[in-house]
Amino acid sequence: MNILIDNRQDKVDAINLEELVEKVIKTVLEVEEVIDNVEVSVSFVDNEEIRKLNKYYRGIDKPTDVLSFPLAEFEDTYGEVEEIEEDSEEVQPIGDIVISLEKALEQSMEYGHSFEREVAYLTAHSMLHLLGYDHETEEERKIMREKEEEVMARLNIGR
């Protein structure tokens, strides 16, 4: 498994976040029983950079907390990356995650929990998007929320 983390901001201290993000990604893959020969890219940015990305890709000219850019194709069931053999040594990139640490810090204060908990949750949420989950309908939202809560519980990260 390759997890590439790039801190592209200097407004929020990112010390110790790499290890946390790696644990969350590995836990999501375990929960989803996804083979581990995948690659995920994570970028930490500030509100201005994520605002630009949000405007370009989603037409929304305001900062958001996290953006997910899936690269892999999925079958009808969640988390099953096509065209990868379990015994294959080929690493399959499944997507990119962009987290605004500035927004995550704001939200952690707003919601009354730790900054680390917010970053962990955003990472889990985004990973589930990379694995084919969405929250366009109430049923999809419920399924995705249950998965997020399972990941957070396995990591023993509460509110």
UniProtKB/Swiss-Prot annotation:
Cofactor note: Binds 1 zinc ion.
Gene3D superfamilies: Metalloproteases ('zincins'), catalytic domain (3.40.390.30)
Location(s) in or outside the cell: Cytoplasm
Role this protein plays: Single strand-specific metallo-endoribonuclease involved in late-stage 70S ribosome quality control and in maturation of the 3' terminus of the 16S rRNA.
Name assigned to this protein: Endoribonuclease YbeY
GO molecular function annotation: metalloendopeptidase activity; RNA endonuclease activity; zinc ion binding
Pfam families, A to Z: YbeY
Keyword entries, A-Z: Cytoplasm, Endonuclease, Hydrolase, Metal-binding, Nuclease, Ribosome biogenesis, rRNA processing, Zinc
Residues that, per the record, bind Zn(2+): H125, H129, H135
Disulfide bridge map: none
GO biological process entries: rRNA processing
Cofactor: Zn(2+)
Family annotation (InterPro entries): MetalPrtase_cat_dom_sf_prd, YbeY, YbeY_CS
Family: Belongs to the endoribonuclease YbeY family.
Protein's organism: Thermoanaerobacter pseudethanolicus (strain ATCC 33223 / 39E)
Cellular component terms per the entry's GO annotation: cytoplasm
EC number: 3.1.-.-
PROSITE patterns noted in UniProt: UPF0054
Organism superkingdom: Bacteria
